Amino acid sequence: MAEVEETLKRLQSQKGVQGIIVVNTEGIPIKSTMDNPTTTQYASLMHSFILKARSTVRDIDPQNDLTFLRIRSKKNEIMVAPDKDYFLIVIQNPTE
């Protein structure tokens, strides 16, 4: 667990990072550097988005899988690294 904590600290120290959320496969936040309402909102919305994106990738090619997802808007950039047991979500300011 110390390795996970160290990785989260390292990511959080990167310029522009606003928050990090680790979500289990059911969409329940396990760890977060953000406040509770924001964590819950991102976890819920990104969980369904990731499942849809993964399904789309597999529909196109059943031998393929989603390995990374990046969404950039005017205000934020959301990066997701899905794994079999959890999803790592990083929210950052793209202009910093």
From Swiss-Prot:
Pfam families per UniProt:
Robl_LC7 (PF03259)
**InterPro entries from the entry?**
DYNLRB1/2, Roadblock/LAMTOR2_dom
Name any one GO molecular function.
identical protein binding
User: What quaternary structure, including any partners, is listed in this protein's UniProt entry?
Assistant: Homodimer. The cytoplasmic dynein 1 complex consists of two catalytic heavy chains (HCs) and a number of non-catalytic subunits presented by intermediate chains (ICs), light intermediate chains (LICs) and light chains (LCs); the composition seems to vary in respect to the IC, LIC and LC composition. The heavy chain homodimer serves as a scaffold for the probable homodimeric assembly of the respective non-catalytic subunits. The ICs and LICs bind directly to the HC dimer and the LCs assemble on the IC dimer. Interacts with DYNLRB2. Interacts with DYNC1I1 and DYNC1I2.
Name of the coding gene: DYNLRB1
Q: Return the protein name.
A: Dynein light chain roadblock-type 1
**Where in the sequence is N-acetylalanine found?**
2
- What GO cellular component is one of the record's annotations? cytoplasmic dynein complex
Main localization of the protein described in the UniProt heading: cytoplasm
Q: Tissue-wise, where is it found?
A: High expression in heart, liver, brain and pancreas; moderate in placenta, skeletal muscle and kidney; low in lung, prostate, testis, small intestine and colon. Isoform 1 expression is up-regulated in 64% hepatocellular carcinoma (HCC) patients.
Which family is annotated? Belongs to the GAMAD family.
Judging by the UniProt lineage, the source's domain of life is Eukaryota
For the keyword Acetylation, the answer is: yes
Cell compartments where the protein resides: Cytoplasm, Cytoskeleton
Q: Which UniProt keywords apply?
A: Acetylation, Cytoplasm, Cytoskeleton, Dynein, Microtubule, Motor protein, Transport
Q: What does this protein do?
A: Acts as one of several non-catalytic accessory components of the cytoplasmic dynein 1 complex that are thought to be involved in linking dynein to cargos and to adapter proteins that regulate dynein function. Cytoplasmic dynein 1 acts as a motor for the intracellular retrograde motility of vesicles and organelles along microtubules.
Annotated GO biological processes are:
microtubule-based movement; visual behavior
